[in-house]
From Swiss-Prot:
Source organism phylogeny: Bacteria, Pseudomonadati, Pseudomonadota, Gammaproteobacteria, Pseudomonadales
Keyword set includes Transcription: yes
Keywords, comma-separated and alphabetical: DNA-directed RNA polymerase, Nucleotidyltransferase, Transcription, Transferase
Highest taxon of source: Bacteria
Record field: catalytic activity: RNA(n) + a ribonucleoside 5'-triphosphate = RNA(n+1) + diphosphate
Database matches in CDD domains: RNA_pol_B_RPB2
Protein family per UniProt: Belongs to the RNA polymerase beta chain family.
Subunit-structure text: The RNAP catalytic core consists of 2 alpha, 1 beta, 1 beta' and 1 omega subunit. When a sigma factor is associated with the core the holoenzyme is formed, which can initiate transcription.
Protein name in the entry: DNA-directed RNA polymerase subunit beta
Species, as recorded: Pseudomonas putida (strain W619)
Length: 1357
């Protein structure tokens, strides 16, 4: 296999046994593809596909005026260029967006002409607001903060059949219902009531009999009955009644008389129940007429109206129950034939017939009026209004849309073969749904499972943005329609008709404040990726936490390979917010698909198909771990498979598909947990969630025991610098990498230079530090896709969230009681868990009523010492160490005139005005914060003079840009001259540049000429002259291009900033705060094993082994058995082996062993103990040595989920590292030197420091603010609040009889306003007495009682 630049330097020993059939797909594809589809940015007018913006425009346009004399048509749109790039947007606090310009055509028709001749056509581009762009990492920058739009899992449009599970009626009878859900428009529900009549509801309003809807659709009673029922035909001749017999219909009935065949042989005796055997005999005998007694038709329902043959008068309407009186009438009228409905109690109930009987309407108009009354109660119905309303409900494309998905689901559910069709409903659709519902009630067919992933689809960013955009356009449409009527008379242009504000507002609201537009979780690369791959059932059009029951939240069999069964939050959102599985993707309809290998006749192929939950149901799917031979044949007699959403076993020849990988079941976060298969699910859930909270440490440290997914996450998350094209590193420093692109990847006419500016010490959304460090050196060769620089929490292109710690599982002095963690001081000294946090502090100078605020170093009543870190502009220097209360930006605010005392007047007269009319409102460092200023940004409003600091910052930025562009030009120039040198070498000169004709060019000749002189050469060959001219022109063009680029950037920097109204200047100061680990910080492993640091012990006191190596962390062994996360023990053992092998390699290097010996030992590690084979043959000796050097701190291992290291392999690794195979060692107490009784499990575990730091939580109140009503101190750190002394605490003091303490707690320390001020005065006077008064809460109580209308007063004697 081919190794990438970083893989070659450090190979991870992989224990997986199964072959890689398919690489893990790009992890952010779900976001990027969806939004790319929405914008269709590169497409030309003819290439637009009917999705996204284009579809939204097409659905609203053309807009036709009310009179029909003018129309506005949509032609196409184009997107402009963004004003700022992503980094500038974040810095300036603006949205990263592009202007949208739409080309529309205004057509005015001639009123006079009969055939609507066109009078005038105007075409124009109209600005329609800004559309936010997605960054290449799948995020949006909205108002300077990075946000993620989470995908939504909602009910797919279509038709669903369900029942109430017997909960509605006390008898427990199942009431069936059908619901047609469109993509937009009114919901249509059909439901049975306990009496078995069918009702319809529109938009969940009052119910009507379903027949009302059928009547409104134009069906008569007879047509309805014909549609839903078959008929029995009876012939009457005199007193005799005979039935046209269909034998099947008799099944289950009791014979009312003997039934004979033609020969008179009795087939069924009277009183016997007719069975299937009897039916067969009747069919064989060919009995098709049956004489029946008159009573046989009593109680049956007529299928057609019964008409008097002579007079034509109607004796009985259709759908009338036959009674004895009616039969007498029929006999009198000498009717020869009656048709009745065929119903029975088993599989053909009289539901529709019964519904028609309770229906009060008799024709279409009455039905329409009834529906109108239900939809618009209180309004007087007219025929036109009722018809319009009904047509608009389900049959108008403007108001109703099933969407392609809805139509496909609808047609499939009611058994049609075609999957495309109209977006609106038809009569047939409604009737088919009713038929299917009645069939289900009759016991044919089954109800749908609403939690099946075939009935839930994913709405991604693009689709949600399109919906919002359409909402905005519909608002515009109303306004345009009104203005169109004026367009003709006033000669308006399209621009005057369209007001883009509603569109811009709808889009802005969606990206800024929708429930699914979330502040990106940017703790570490994994939390970013997980946030973008999240699927939420909440949000607009989705579920709410309170209403979601167990079923929706539960794991469903169809989640397999689509949604992770492990990763979901704990708490109220459990199961509502999920994560996509590693290989899952969405199909064109938005359903989740999972990949499978095709299996034919027991032979597994490498063809891969993606199937949705609906498509996979009929397949027989084997697991990825099913045993195969070399010919890829399944060899087990019975293979474990999934079929019809159940787990079972089948013969190999029945298998049709096979999983592509064992990790296709779980999400990215869960696939990073080694030995996941040995952990309990609840703990795995915690492990997945806690990895997302890990804070990037100062020096990232790759996990010794990983799963092989670390590289994918680091690469796809976008925090690393990945080579866009292959080439050679031209130069590299801490802040940028310059690559000279390989010739075969350079497109003609462009510079073969890629410059990568690295992000240095930038603040993330969670205030952690984003910093990139180069991995490459000058002259290194890189290929496309190689990782050239590490970001936060990445180490050599692998995700590295924590540190490998030497741990021991042992109880030790109670320091690890209840999951506490005991650490060694060495961890702190080596800065293993030191993290850098960056805080942004902002100072805003506004224009106030009394005058402008001013940012200055001249602050009243502040000593010189407090100002020594500020420059002359009043802004702190970069690099200054500041602590709580230090001034960062000096600011003064004008203050209103106050009445002055005579003394103040005198002082003013002597010392001048200045000091008194302004107050100090400087930006100071908040309490509990201490750090270093690493950056300052100054933004000034247009027209306000910029201070010296702003100019200095601007000059620095310009120098940076100029340096970049010069570098690019230098390389372009160098590469051009290199190409020329190779072309000219050995060629003959025709003259020019001071050379004689006939001179042969050599390297010396060229070195003797200045570069400018080369272009003056005239060569004997014309082709070379042409090449020289082209090269000269190319260099001139490049120079001009780069100069233009510089001017453009300069213009952007020098123009004033667009600040909020009333703001003159904003200064942002960035503080870097360094936090070491300390007691109270939360730490965790990857297996849900979390704890709080309880104590940090000196190194010499920690337990140590026989060699004197102390352990770093002591964990409580009781934390393992009850939690059932045994994965941590296996990780510890394997980690010990990994470290031991590293130390062995280190010794070999120190003893200066030969490369061949090292190669032999590495082969033993990588290729002799299970797992994937590594091809060490292709490595040179230098590369083997470089590899060995990188393995000194431990050989990293990968144990993929469900396909990891076996116990025997861990033991073999320990043996190879010359360590005990039990993984246990004898330890000695560092304090006494005594040996512990039993051997202790010691090894290396990967530990994370979570973003729950004690520094952020510790807080103490001194003097602070009080609540307005109760006058009690506020609560919480943000409000600088106090600790609540609640009722239980009061009981405790009462119980101890601590009366004075209790009194001051309830009065002066809380809400006795006078008492507390008096106490302060007393303390100042040196008088330590306390006089409690009336607590304010008593006054509040009295006011509340009075509000109930009870007069209450406190009498003070």
């Amino acid at each position: 296999m081919a190794y990438s630049y970083t893989e070659k330097k450090r190979i991870r020993k992989d224990f997986s046994k199964l072959p890689d059939v398919m690489d893990v797909p790009y992890l952010l594809a779900i976001q990027l593809d969806s939004y790319r589809e929405f914008l269709q940015a590169g497409a030309s007018k003819d290439q637009f596909r009917d999705v996204g913006l284009h579809a939204a425009f097409k659905s609203v346009f053309p807009i036709i005026s009310y009179s029909g004399n003018a129309a506005l048509e949509y032609v196409g749109y184009r997107l402009g260029e963004p004003a700022f790039d992503v980094k500038e947007c974040v810095l300036r606090g603006v949205t990263f967006a592009v202007p949208l310009r739409v080309k529309v055509r205004l057509i005015i028709f001639d009123k006079e002409s009969s055939n609507k001749a066109i009078k005038d056509i105007k075409e124009q581009e109209v600005y329609m607001g800004e559309i936010p762009l997605m960054t290449e990492n799948g995020t949006f920058v909205i108002n300077g903060t990075e946000r993620v739009i989470v995908s939504q899992l909602h009910r797919s449009p279509g038709v669903f059949f369900d029942h109430d599970r017997g909960k509605t009626h006390s008898s427990g009878k199942l009431l069936y219902s059908a619901r047609i859900i469109p993509y937009r428009g009114s919901w249509l529900d059909f439901e049975f009531d306990p009496k078995d009549c069918v009702f319809v509801r529109i938009d969940r309003r009052r119910k009507l009999p379903a027949s009302v809807l059928l009547r409104a659709l134009g069906y008569s009673t007879e047509e309805v009955l014909n549609t839903f029922y078959t008929t029995n035909v009876f012939h009457i001749s005199g007193e005799k009644l005979s039935l046209e017999l269909v034998p099947q219909r008799l099944r289950g009935e009791v014979a009312v008389m003997d039934i004979h065949d033609e020969t008179g042989k009795v087939i069924v005796e009277q009183g016997r129940r007719i069975t299937a055997r009897h039916v067969n005999q009747l069919e064989k005998a060919g009995v098709n007429q049956l004489d029946v007694p008159m009573e046989y038709v009593l109680g049956r329902t007529t299928a057609k109206a019964i008409v008097h043959p002579a007079t034509g008068e109607i004796i009985a309407e259709c759908n009338t129950e036959l009674t004895t009186e009616l039969l007498i009438k029929i006999a009198k009228a000498q009717v020869v034939r009656i048709e009745t409905l065929y119903t029975n109690d088993i599989d053909c109930g009289p539901f529709i017939s019964d519904t028609l009987k309770i229906d009060t309407t008799s024709n279409q108009l009455e039905a329409l009026v009834e529906i109108y009354r239900m939809m618009r109660p209180g309004e007087p119905p007219t025929k036109d209004a009722a018809e319009t309303l009904f047509n608009n409900l389900f049959f108008s494309a403007e108001r109703y849309d099933l969407s392609a998905v809805g139509r496909m689901k609808f047609n499939r559910r009611i058994g049609r073969t075609e999957i495309e069709g109209s977006g609106v409903l038809s009569k047939e659709d409604i009737v088919e749904v009713l038929k299917t519902l009645v069939d289900i009630r009759n016991g044919k067919g089954i109800v749908d499972d609403i939690d099946h992933l075939g009935n839930r689809r994913v709405r991604c960013v693009g689709e949600m943005a399109e919906n919002q955009f359409r909402v905005g356009l519909v608002r515009v449409e109303r306004a345009v329609k009104e203005r169109l009527s004026m367009a003709e008379s006033e000669g308006l242009m399209p621009q005057d008709l369209i007001n883009a504000k509603p569109v811009a507002a709808a889009v802005k609201e969606f990206f800024g404040s929708s429930q699914l537009s979330q502040f990106m979780d940017q703790n570490n690369p994994l939390s970013e990726i997980t946030h973008k791959r999240r699927v939420s059932a909440l949000g607009p059009g989705g579920l709410t936490r309170e209403r979601a029951g167990f079923e929706v939240r539960d794991v469903h069999p169809t989640h397999y390979g689509r949604v992770c069964p492990i990763e979901t939050p704990e708490g109220p959102n459990i199961g509502l917010i999920n994560s996509l599985a590693a290989y899952a993707r969405t199909n064109q309809y938005g359903f989740l698909e999972s990949p499978y290998r095709v299996v034919k006749e027991g032979v597994v192929s490498d063809d891969i198909v993606f199937l949705s939950a609906i498509e996979e149901a009929d397949h027989v799917i084997a697991q990825a771990s099913a045993a195969m031979n070399d010919k890829k044949q399944l060899i087990d007699e019975l293979v474990a498979v999934r079929h019809l959403n159940e787990f079972t076993v089948k013969a190999p020849e029945d298998v049709t598909l096979m999983d592509v990988s064992p990790k296709q079941v779980v999400s990215v976060a869960a696939s990073l947990i080694p030995f996941l298969e040995h952990d309990d699910a609840n703990r795995a859930l915690m492990g997945s969630n806690m990895q997302r909270q890990a804070v990037p440490t100062l020096r990232a440290d790759k996990p010794l025991v990983g799963t092989g997914m670390e590289r994918n996450v680091a690469r796809d998350s976008g925090v690393c610098v990945v080579a866009r094209r292959g080439g050679v590193i031209d130069s590299v420093d801490a802040s940028r990498i310059v690559v000279r692109v390989a010739d075969d990847e350079v497109e003609t006419g462009e510079a073969g230079v890629d410059i990568y500016n690295l992000t240095k010490y930038t603040r993330s959304n969670q205030n952690t530090c984003i910093n990139q460090r180069p991995l490459v050196s000058k002259g290194d060769k890189v290929a496309r896709g190689d990782i050239m620089a590490d970001g936060p929490s990445t180490d050599m292109g692998e995700l590295a969230l924590g540190q490998n710690m030497r741990i021991a599982f042992m109880a030790w002095n109670g320091f690890n009681f209840e999951d506490s963690i005991c650490l060694s001081e060495r961890v702190v000294q080596e800065d293993r868990f030191t993290t850098i946090h960056i805080q942004e502090l902002t100072c805003v100078a506004r224009d106030t009523k009394l005058g402008p605020e001013e940012i200055t170093a001249d602050i009243p009543n502040v000593g010189e010492a407090a100002l020594n870190k500020l420059d002359e502009a009043g802004i702190v220097y970069v690099g200054a160490e500041v602590g709580a209360g230090d001034i960062l930006v000096g600011k003064v605010t004008p203050k209103g005139e106050t009445q002055l005392t005579p003394e103040e007047k005198l002082l003013r007269a002597i010392f001048g005005e200045k000091a008194s009319d302004v107050k100090d409102t400087s930006l100071r460092v908040p309490t509990g914060t201490k750090g270093t200023v690493i950056d300052v940004q100054v933004f000034t409003r247009d027209g306000v003079e910029r201070d010296s600091r702003a100019l200095a910052i601007e000059k620095m930025q310009l120098d940076e840009i100029r340096k970049d562009l010069n570098e690019e030009f230098r390389i372009v120039e160098g590469a051009t001259f290199e190409r020329l040198r190779s072309a000219l070498n050995g060629q003959v000169v025709d003259g020019g540049a001071g050379l004689k004709k006939g001179t042969v060019i050599t390297d010396e000749v060229l070195d003797g000429l200045e570069h400018g002189q080369w272009f003056k050469l005239r060569m004997a060959e014309d082709a070379l002259n042409e090449q020289l001219e082209k090269a000269q022109q190319y260099i001139v063009d490049r120079r001009r291009l780069l100069d233009d680029k510089f001017e453009d950037k300069k213009r952007k920097l020098q123009q004033g900033d667009d600040l909020a109204p009333g703001v003159l200047k904003i200064v942002k100061v960035y503080l870097a705060i360094r936090r070491r680990i300390q007691p109270g910080d939360k730490m965790a492993g990857r297996h849900g094993n979390k704890g709080v640091v309880s104590v940090i012990m000196p190194v010499e006191d920690m337990p140590h082994d026989a060699n004197g190596t102390p352990v770093d962390v002591v964990l409580n062994p009781l934390g393992v058995p009850s939690r059932m996360n045994v994965g941590q023990i296996l990780e510890t053992h394997l980690g010990l082996a990994a470290k031991g092998l590293g130390e062995k390699i280190d010794r070999m290097i120190e003893e200066q062993r030969k490369a061949a010996e090292l190669r032999g030992f590495l082969t033993e590690i990588y290729n002799e103990i299970g797992g994937r084979q590594e091809n060490l043959e292709e490595f040179t000796d230098e590369e083997i040595l470089a590899l060995a050097h990188n393995l000194k701190k431990g050989v990293p291992m990968a144990t993929p989920v469900f396909d990891g290291a076996k116990e025997r392999e861990i033991k073999a690794m320990l043996k190879l590292a010359d360590l005990p195979e039990s993984g246990q060692m004898v330890l000695f107490d560092g304090r006494t030197g005594n040996k512990f009784e039993r051997p202790v499990t010691v090894g290396y575990m990967y530990m994370l420091k979570l973003n729950h730091l004690v520094d952020d939580k510790m807080h103490a109140r001194s003097t602070g603010s009080y609540s307005l009503v109760t006058q009690q101190p506020l609560g919480g750190k943000a409000q600088f609040g106090g600790q609540r002394f609640g009722e239980m605490e009061v009981w405790a003091l009462e119980a101890y009889g601590a009366a004075y303490t209790l009194q001051e707690m309830l009065t002066v320390k809380s809400d006795d306003v006078n008492g507390r001020t008096k106490m302060y005065k007393n303390i100042v006077d040196g008088d330590h007495r306390m006089e409690p008064g009336m607590p304010e809460s008593f006054n509040v109580l009295i006011k509340e009682i009075r509000s109930l209308g009870i007069d209450i007063d406190l009498e003070t004697e």
